[in-house]
Amino acid sequence: MKLSELLEKYRIEEKFEVKNEKNFDTLALTQSDIRIPNCTFVDDKKYVGTLNDSVRMVLTTSEISRELDLNRVGLCIVDNPRNTYFKLHNALKDCLEYVRPTFKTKIGENTTISKWASIAENNVIIGDNVIIDDFVMVHANTTIGDNCIIRSGVKLGSVDFEFKRDGNEVFGVEHYGGLVLRNNVEIQCNTVVNRALYPWDNTTISEFTKIDANVMISHGVKIGARNMIVAGSVIGGRTLLGDDCWVGLSATLKNGISVGNGARIN
């Protein structure tokens, strides 16, 4: 994909200046751990040194552009890089080069699904020996492994809270990513686990993790194996939680932090 062509096609920016344009395949934040050639944005000088090797294009301001190495990345200079970036992300909702392909939902053997549950018709994979109780909602781009138990009222693969201010208006950001529950996960009543924002990313709950009622898990979170997460806990977006952790009653983990193996949070 070429940024100049996309900005013109979707009429996102009337005024922009491109230098040393390079092709890219997806969008990502500056420090995203991916190897896919991507376009990102930098609207603060403190992020200039955080670009990973997969970045090809950077949306940025005229002032910050002077701090970036044109030999390494291409630049697109705009007034508000953050808003331009997320408006482009939203505009690509029907772009087959960007979003995930569509397939019919697949359900494994010996799986029990309540007639009151709602399962998306497309882009869901449910393994063998799964139990899904009443009033569960499973949205597209969700994978549920074998031997999982999903109790009443759970919401899987929902859209998360991501909004941007734009003058006197506020716009929401589309979520094209997925949610993966690995084998032997149990989630109790009325918990919400949201899908990731980017099409290349998943919110992930690993093997044998048990999640209590009324827990909120945000987009892009990665939870390791054999964790126990107690009622009322909140885990902010893009947080990484290792294996064998305990997250106690009503604990809150802010977004973007990393917690090692065997941690105890109360």
Residue ranges and their predicted role:
Residues 1-104, 109-110, 147, 153-154, ...:
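Terminal amphipathic alpha-helical/low-complexity segments used for targeting or macromolecular assembly
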Residues 41, 100-266:
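Structural signal for interior beta-strand "rungs" in well-ordered beta-sheet cores
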